[in-house]
Amino acid sequence: MWELSLSPPKIEFMLLSAAANFRIHIMKLNIVPARTGITWVKSGIQIFLKQPLAMSSLFFMFMATLSFASLFPFVGAALALALLPATTLGLMAATQEASTGKFPIPTILISAFRAGRQRLGAMLVLGVLYAAGFLALMGVSSLIDGGQFAKLYLVGGKITQEMVMQSDFQLAMWVTLALYLPLSLLFWHAPALVHWHGVPPVKSLFFSLMACYKNGAALTVYALVWAGLFVLAMLMVTLFAALLGSPMFAGVAMFPVALVMMAMFFTSIYFTFRDSFVDNPSGQTAAQTLLVP
């Protein structure tokens, strides 16, 4: 049941927990300025550089887990998608551990699977919802180009110039990217809300979307800074290859550099959650409060 009370300048939404299956911690939505997006990027890079071996190893384990899951016949792609929220939470837990000065051990990657039956079940539901949403998105793109883009993304294959030049393929790609934005916002904070706050899966999607909307300026800056850093890294590799007079160097170096950049990016995701939600100091667990300015 929802209770709405107006208390200027804030509106307080209180969810009374009718089901005793979840212990839901009271939390507050924290609105941050746009410049915080830069802080999130810097924090992710700093934590990665403090523990580069641990964070890069965990990221490679993360990638290997999803790659292995995708190898299963027929259900591989869906299984990998369903595991993404839980494994992403593992990387966030590793960042949290590293930010306190501790060394994140490999088993932290499966934190979501060791949080008890109730939260494990909630995380699995979240994974199924993500897989269903992503596959539905791919279904929409298949209506445009006959499934070329979806097959390439989910199954793999060779990209040909002829394929890329097709207008239907290009439209399917752009439609997929446009539809993926709201899907990613729904699930951006959801794994952490389920794991650390005990929020039920569907409600975690709502809270995640609202938090992303309220902190949209900071997230936009965050995304733009990361995009700029990725482009800069690729340009530096290309320039270095040109100075060496070895085009082959660029091809060899691009992949590991991109992996390191991705590892840094995933390390920074935890900070977007940490600064967007604040625990209520009272520590009550009977209800969940979301404060919206």
PLM regions: where:
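Serine residues within intrinsically disordered or low-complexity segments
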Residues: 5-7, 17
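Hydrophobic alpha-helical membrane segments
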Residues: 13, 19-293
